[in-house]
């Protein structure tokens, strides 16, 4: 399939690119700084652009099958990059008839937050106080996705690690993860790529952890 990955040079994005290529997909990696992106492959197209420019975003969505958003937020930075990017991604997908959108959300925002224990919600609230900009950015992004008519899936991991891909983890919308729950970025990528044709979680916010 033809995949476009935003945030391809990020920690999870790099796993998405590598695993997608292993699976035989044709990958378009959208990056701002090509110097920060080392992978090279015959089925990899590296496009340099700015998620804040609608035409840049649209140029890598036309003709694709699936869009994956692996955009991260920077602590203490109020640039709203996730919201701005998604505000361009959604209409471009609608314009070109690309249906499947898979996003990395989080346990502290959206419906997934309701699955946290009382203590988990307390911890999430504390993190929100420490970095309200990041939480607001992800929340605004998820609202844009939820309000679209796309076949979206909002993947909600807890604490992320740099551990290996195992392919073995819990996932579902009704899980109640402990506050110590974690999962590797490699396994988040593994799960996301399994959603590109699976309809199980369309319009939902699956949680995954070990």
Question: Which residues does each predicted region cover?
Answer:
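N-terminal Rossmann NAD(P)H-binding glycine-rich loop of SDR-like oxidoreductase domains
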Residues: 3-23
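N-terminal Rossmann-fold cofactor-binding loop
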Residues: 30-35, 50-51
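Conserved Rossmann-fold cofactor-binding substructure of NAD(P)-dependent oxidoreductases
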Residues: 45-65
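NAD(P)-cofactor binding segment of oxidoreductase domains
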Residues: 74-101, 140
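Substrate-positioning beta->alpha
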Residues: 81-86, 137, 155, 183-193, ...
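Conserved catalytic-site region of short-chain dehydrogenase/reductase
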Residues: 107-113, 160-163
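Glycine/proline-rich active-site loop of Rossmann-fold NAD(P)-dependent oxidoreductases
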Residues: 111, 164-169, 195-204
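Conserved beta-loop-beta element that borders a ligand/cofactor-binding pocket
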Residues: 142-163
């Amino acid at each position: 399939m033809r995949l476009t990955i935003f945030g391809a040079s990020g920690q999870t994005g790099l796993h998405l690119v590598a695993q997608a290529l292993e699976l035989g997909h044709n990958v378009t990696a959208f990056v701002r700084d090509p110097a920060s992106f080392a992978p090279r492959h015959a089925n990899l197209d590296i496009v340099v652009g700015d998620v804040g420019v609608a035409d840049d975003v649209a140029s890598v969505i036309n003709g694709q099958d699936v869009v994956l958003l692996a955009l991260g937020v920077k602590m203490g930075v109020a640039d709203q990059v996730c919201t701005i990017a998604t505000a361009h991604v959604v209409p471009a997908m609608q314009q070109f008839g690309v249906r499947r959108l898979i996003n990395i959300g989080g346990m502290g925002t959206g419906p997934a937050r309701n699955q946290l224990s009382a203590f988990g919600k307390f911890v999430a609230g504390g993190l929100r106080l420490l970095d309200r900009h990041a939480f607001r950015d992800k929340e605004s992004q998820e609202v844009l996705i939820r309000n679209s008519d796309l076949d979206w899936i909002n993947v909600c991991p807890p604490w992320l690690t740099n551990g290996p891909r195992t392919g073995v983890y819990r996932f579902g919308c009704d899980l109640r993860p402990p506050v110590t729950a974690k999962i590797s970025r490699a396994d988040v990528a593994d799960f996301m790529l399994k959603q590109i044709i699976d309809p199980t979680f369309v319009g939902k916010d699956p949680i995954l952890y070990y």
